[in-house]
A protein has these predicted regions:
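Conserved flavin/dinucleotide-binding core of flavoenzymes
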Residues: 2-18, 318, 323-430
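N-terminal Rossmann-like FAD-binding beta1-loop-alpha1 element of flavoenzymes
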Residues: 23-50, 423
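Glycine-rich FAD pyrophosphate-binding loop
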Residues: 42-66
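Glycine-rich active-site loop/strand segments that organize a redox cofactor
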Residues: 62-80, 141-151
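Helical element adjacent to the flavin cofactor pocket in flavoenzyme catalytic cores
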Residues: 198-249, 255, 259
Length: 430
């Protein structure tokens, strides 16, 4: 059985009822940007309504349930050092489950461990002798860990690959570890993403843990939404256009509001704003989830393709990260595909299974495909740093991960920035 996890009905207001009143603010989009904006405006005492065409909150950050397994819509993680996430979220209530600080790299027929020497000193010392880069490369990683790549965060724009070469990394280190690792973050393996995004996420990797909520990434937007007052969400309703003094829904209903915040994905935001926003290109991804009788890796660790052959870029046994992701006695394997992400399911499944057999042997024949998520607009492809101001015009604002170097954290920060801009202008008008 497959179903989307949703909030309780008490949180949701029907569009017809919403149209009977006027709001201080209507927020279009119930992703993490829109919900963060709503939280900030609610704390300031504004009467608001969040509208989304989907049947649940979260946008791209959602978790489905399939035969007792929790399936995030694409492999996603939370970096615990994200400053905005620390501000907005209650980590204890999320019951975060942390990944091993390092990775397993599949290279030349074997799994090679790369460990953070600051958190796993013994394993880090042993990894010095594996063929995933030279000793000098490992020392450069340590240096970059302490510097956080700050010198790449300012100055002329350059791509991540150039930044790595400026750091002195060898081709072996880049191809066997950094390309698949950062490729899994950016969802592109050419590493053309701006080095400013690289510097931003590298600092967070160095300063904290990689984690997921025990019950799936969807718990993050669900926690944000749970803080809103009853009836502040209008789900299953699509905003067709902005109108004078509010928004018009696709069913013809109009909802009056003094202010409107567009918190949708970039393409939809551009449509609603009549070309006032230039939407970025996006990187796509496929994520395939498999049910396995036993876990092929018995630890909460990220596995990387260091050979560069086959469709899989990275793999994780999610049930080893959090037992909640799979029913008792079963394992959940997540495989991320970048280069061939758009392939049809039967074609991609055959190629992925062939790689499974190469990595894990005949046990992979017994694995059952649960679901294939093909996500066309997964992450904005940013070769330069976008700087989208939250104010579009009087009473209209925009937020989302496309407004800054894209991440879960920047989406939250963008939502709060839009709320702050709105409140400042509202105070000035008063």
């Amino acid at each position: 059985m497959f179903f989307s996890r949703r909030l309780g009905a008490a949180a949701i207001r029907r569009a017809g009822r919403a149209s009977l009143r006027s709001y201080d603010v209507v927020i279009v989009g119930a992703g993490v940007a829109g919900l963060s904006c709503a939280r900030t405006l609610q704390a300031a005492g504004l009467d608001l309504l969040v509208i989304d065409a989907a049947d649940g909150v979260g946008g791209r950050v959602r978790t489905d349930v399939c035969d007792g397994f929790l399936l995030d819509r694409g492999f996603q993680v939370l970096l615990t050092a994200y400053p905005e996430a620390r501000r907005m979220l209650d980590y204890d209530r999320l019951r975060l489950r942390r990944f091993y600080p390092g990775a397993l790299v599949r290279y030349s027929g074997k799994w090679r461990r790369v460990a953070d020497p600051m958190r796993r000193p013994f394993a880090g010392a042993l990894s010095v002798f594996n063929p995933i880069g030279s000793l000098a490369d490992k020392l450069r990683v340590g240096r970059l860990r302490f510097s956080g790549g700050r010198r790449h965060a300012t100055g002329p724009e350059k791509d991540t690959l150039r930044a790595l070469r400026e750091e002195g990394f060898s081709d072996a280190m880049i191809e066997r570890f950094l390309r698949p690792f950062l490729g899994g973050v950016f969802l592109e393996t050419e590493l053309r993403t701006t080095a400013r995004k690289f510097a931003s996420v590298w600092r967070r990797f160095a300063a904290g843990d990689i984690a997921v909520p025990a019950e799936g990434m969807g718990r993050i937007p669900e926690q944000l939404a749970a803080e809103l007052p009853e009836g502040a969400l209008c789900l299953g309703s699509r905003v067709e256009a902005l109108g004078p003094g509010g928004v018009r829904l696709s069913d013809g209903e109009s909802i009056a509001a003094a202010n409107v915040v567009i918190a949708t994905e970039a393409g939809e935001a551009a449509r609603l704003l009549d070309g006032r926003l230039d939407p970025p290109e996006f990187n796509g991804v496929s994520c395939l989830y498999f049910e396995a009788p036993t876990p092929p890796l018995r630890e909460p660790i990220l596995a990387l393709n260091g050979d560069g052959t086959g469709p899989i870029n990275n793999l994780t046994v999610m049930s080893e990260v959090s037992a909640c992701y799979a029913p008792e006695g079963k394992a959940l394997v997540s495989a991320t595909v970048l280069k061939a992400w758009a392939s049809e399911t039967p074609v991609l499944e055959r190629a992925v299974r062939a790689q499974f057999r190469d990595w894990f042997g005949e046990q992979a024949n017994a694995w059952k495909l649960l679901r294939h998520y093909r996500i066309k607009h997964a992450v904005p492809f940013q070769t330069s740093s976008p700087l989208v101001a939250p104010r579009v015009r009087k009473g209209v604002y925009v937020c989302g991960d496309h407004c800054d170097v894209a991440s879960l954290d920047s989406a939250m920060a963008s939502g709060r920035a839009a709320a702050a801009c709105l409140l400042e202008e509202r105070a000035a008008r008063a």
